[in-house]
Amino acid sequence: IDLLNRWYGCKKIPIGATTREKNSTMSHVKNFTEVVCQMKDEKGRPLYKQLPEGKENWQDAVMLHRQLLAKSDDHSVTIISVGFSNNLSALLASQPDGFSPMNGKELVAKKVDRLVVMAGHMENPNYKEFNVINDVPACQKVYDEWPTPIYTSPFELGEKILYPARSIKED
């Protein structure tokens, strides 16, 4: 996300680090972010400028969600999730803190207008979609307990959206 933000000149968008991956069943899969950051051009140079600071310096994703939601107007936030559900599940379970006297579910209900999630496969219920199977309990918690409308962009929609890498590089 940071890489894309910087690519498009949006350098000040804060990035939270995932620290809650206890239920992940996909620890053997290489981190997608690392794969993208290691991409090279035809001359063997990094395709993207590397991060100025390591992930260890990023704020915890749940705390960042709480901080940003607490500052937001009521029902003004659209959250778009294009990955696993563990951060959103942990946000729902979060307790009051210095950012807000509300628990996570209350804070989401007050500040979030909708959640848009890239997950699942509607045409084939037996398909093991990557964003879901990585942490099934977290995904179930989000779909069961999220207090605002959820809009799902399923696998079969995403697989039809082909975007040329050349355009990302040149446009």
Model-derived regions: residue spans:
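N-terminal acidic, glycine/proline-rich low-complexity segments
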Residues: 1-171
